[in-house]
Amino acid sequence: MIAIENLHAYYGNIHAIKGISFQVRKGEITALIGANGAGKSTTIKSICGLLHPREGKILLNGSPIQRMSADQVVHLGVGYVPEGRRVFPVLTVDENLDMGAYGRSNRAEIARDREKMYEMFPQLKNRVKQLAGSLSGGEQQMLAIARALMSSPQLLLMDEPSLGLAPLLVKQVFEIIAGLNREGLTILLSEQNARGALKIAHHGIVMETGKVRFADTARALQENPVIQQAYLGVG
């Protein structure tokens, strides 16, 4: 579904992504793991149009998107859950969901999907008119996911969705991600929590200092002694 080919991305003179290549297969969860500063978020931002790479290609279903704007990428069916949740704090829960559907015109379908979000995230249903900035961290993360889903994506990019959450909420977030995938959604999941991410993923990409160090099935990475010692706390 997504193919990354020899991608190079910069922040000014800082070479953040150094010729990475990998694929995200349709219908699967691909986990992008690595330490802070490895290049995971930069990769996600490059795919969703927030950062334009200097070299290389990003192919969505065979078509290049690396020069497209973020709103153009959304219209192609790519949803984005940013690091740190980034909900609109002075808007209500309901208004945040409306923002997620801004590019859609069928009001009946939007209303249907909004109700689906409240069924999926019952915590939000009780806070429809509450300002997003007053929600707990876990509730804000649920809202960020629901907002991205309101764009009706075929591919969901998730940047550190477990960051800053209590262990019980982390488990809940990973269960939600796995459930979305079971419904057919393709997901690229950027995570420092390698153990949790690989547990639900089909494939994994390990990044270090802007490069791909390992790429394999999630199970193979979980069984790799180097990965176990460096990222899974084994050995």
Where do the model's predicted regions map?
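Glycine-rich phosphate-binding loops of nucleotide-dependent enzymes
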Residues: 1-235
